Amino acid sequence: DDGKNQGEYSAIFYDKNKLEVLKSGTFWLSETPEKPSKGWDAAYNRVCTYAFFKIKKSGKKFLAMNLHFDHVGDVARVNSSKLILEKIKELNPQNLPLTLTGDFNLTDDTEPIKIISQSLDNVFYHSRKPHYGPVGTFTAFDVNTVPKDRIDYIFVKGFEVQSNRTINDRRENLLYPSDHFPILAEISFKK
């Protein structure tokens, strides 16, 4: 894991015809977030990637963050939640609207998710329209079981959530392209 060409990463996909990247970077979910590192009791190096965007048409700006929490370390996940909130304050002193997405490897009832939910809105609960699709997001590639555990999230601040959904992307050949269902939220800037 060198932080440049190999190792853990959490990509942010965007439409370059609609959005301009103003600044971007990555930090590690560890005691030394500025360099490739494994934090606390984590099994692997874990990261959060961020990008500040400007919407070309309107000029409005926002921060997008995407992460992958450890699947083993309880201490790492609690501390990662706290670090994320610290980094939001540090990176975003102008308090731009933001999205935080990723595989948190945790269910709603866990302390790390509760920590984040104190500062950011979970789109599952803050949507104008009811959630659509399966509640669970972790498939484990098992097409015979309906996923019950939601471990992937979209959190927002400064956005209104119009709708949110979990997309059942099982193929005709009964194979999943991932062990997680994609999740999607339709959001708009608060007025």
Predicted regions and their residues:
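Active-site metal-binding loops of divalent metal-dependent hydrolases
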Residues: 67-69, 102-104, 181
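Metal-dependent phosphoester-hydrolase catalytic domains
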Residues: 18, 75, 79, 89-98, ...
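Conserved hydrophobic/aromatic beta-strand scaffold that supports enzyme active sites
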Residues: 10-12, 48-52, 66, 153-154, ...
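Hydrophobic/aromatic residues located in beta-strands of well-ordered beta-sheets
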Residues: 64, 98-100
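Structured beta-strand-rich core segments of catalytic domains in phosphoester-bond hydrolases
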Residues: 1-61, 166-167
